[in-house]
Amino acid sequence: MTGGALLVAGTTSDAGKSMLVGGLCRLLVRKGLSVAPFKAQNMSNNSAVTVEGGEIGRAQAMQARAAGLAPSVRFNPILLKPGGDRTSQLVVRGQVTGSVAAADYINHRDHLAAVVADELSSLREDFDAVICEGAGSPAEINLRATDLANMGLARAAALPVIVVGDIDRGGLLAHLHGTVAVLEPADQALVSGFVVNKFRGDPSLLAPGLRQLAELTGRPTYGVIPFHDEIWLDTEDSVSVRPGGLVGAPEPPRGEQTLTVAAIRLPRISNSTDIEALACEPGVVVRWVTDAADLTGADLVVIPGSKATVTDLRWLRERGLAAGIAAHAAAGRAVLGVCGGFQMLCSRIDDPVESREGRVDGLGLLDADIEFAAQKTLRHWETPLHGYEIHHGQVARSAETDWLGIGLRRGAVYGTHWHGLLDNDALRRDWLTEVAAAAGRDGFVVADDVDVSARRDAQLDLMADLIENHLDVGAILDLLEHGAPHRPTMSTALHV
């Protein structure tokens, strides 16, 4: 097999596309194939820095890891980073090219389509298989004219399409049927079959519904992946970051006490994955919060990154969270700001890049000033600590103590521009010891055996195992080798 490719589309956002692609990459590598992930266009503020010094979606970095590859801009040539409700920063081949309004995006389509086609063609020449991920859902037919990642990509590259859906949300059979039904006949012809994700219970109870789905659509279901609560790292979509929701699956504490973490769910949150390493720790309970009352009883408050720092800072004040964070810090308890969250902790922010508000006061918990530069900083660090930087804001003045060469601190208030910092196991353990001491949690015991990197690989191995055990892998390999088989067109009122 050389240059085989398929597209994993979804009934909705957060249906399981990213993890299915990652699991397929890991499984095919196990089978001796060279594999690359590909997402033509991603809309996400969860991003990573590549070996070329560019920027791609974090999910594609995870999928590259699954395939045994370093992250590359080739795997996600178009990245849209929403900074407001109607505009996004446009990143092409890893570099910012400007901002684009949703209504104007169609004017860029031809150029971007050529970039996508070039990168996919190159990957197909270099790898045995390319596993592509769609965006959102192909059922969003209002976006078909500008689509580069779903059926627009599949039609341009003649890719067979597998549609995956999350049955845990309910209504999946209707979603699968309807997704195919609303497509144009030429797009329908590429949809080869379905995958059911996150099924709880006895799969035999689902069998009659899948048989009827096959009769209605003329397409098989390649398998049913069971729900598994260990698969939660590297969340792709902000829809997964729900206010009040727990991060991960909390493990029992090693000592007599737990640590409670309140992570602020900013409206324009970016790189929410930074806090996942905390949730890997036994006895650490991490919850997304949006109200000042939710800070009560927290041992640690985390302000994550933001694609609109000044706007989200104003939101903190409007929600009463700014005052709550200040009170938390005044009580001597720990606060961590990452990237945009770090900038919010400072005294002043001068931002002519992402905001029209100019110079504004920060929370003042760190005596430092931030100035935004037009040129974005993109850095990937490996030694002695590993992490990466993606930011316009620069520290212009500081009267605070340096924190490990990667940030600033005042007492138990910490700030850093580094994403992925808490993935460094030894640093995280030492820092959690400080956090517990500041909170008076003498009965909290930091585990000495948590390896976040190994946990990520174990998750990818688990996803590959689930695919191998529950999907028709032979049929999927046939799609890669032979393309889309003939499938009937579904006649609906849309196509009459």
Swiss-Prot record:
Single GO biological process annotation from the record: cobalamin biosynthetic process
Pfam families, per database record: CbiA, GATase_3
InterPro entries recorded: Class_I_gatase-like, CobQ/CobB/MinD/ParA_Nub-bd_dom, CobQ_GATase1, CobQ_synth, GATase_3, P-loop_NTPase
Residues covered by the GATase cobBQ-type domain: 258-427
Purpose: Catalyzes amidations at positions B, D, E, and G on adenosylcobyrinic A,C-diamide. NH(2) groups are provided by glutamine, and one molecule of ATP is hydrogenolyzed for each amidation.
Protein name from the UniProt record: Cobyric acid synthase
Pathway: Cofactor biosynthesis; adenosylcobalamin biosynthesis
GO MF annotations, alphabetized: ABC-type vitamin B12 transporter activity; catalytic activity
Active-site residue list: C339, H419
Top-level lineage group: Bacteria
Similarity-based family: Belongs to the CobB/CobQ family. CobQ subfamily.
Keywords: Cobalamin biosynthesis, Glutamine amidotransferase
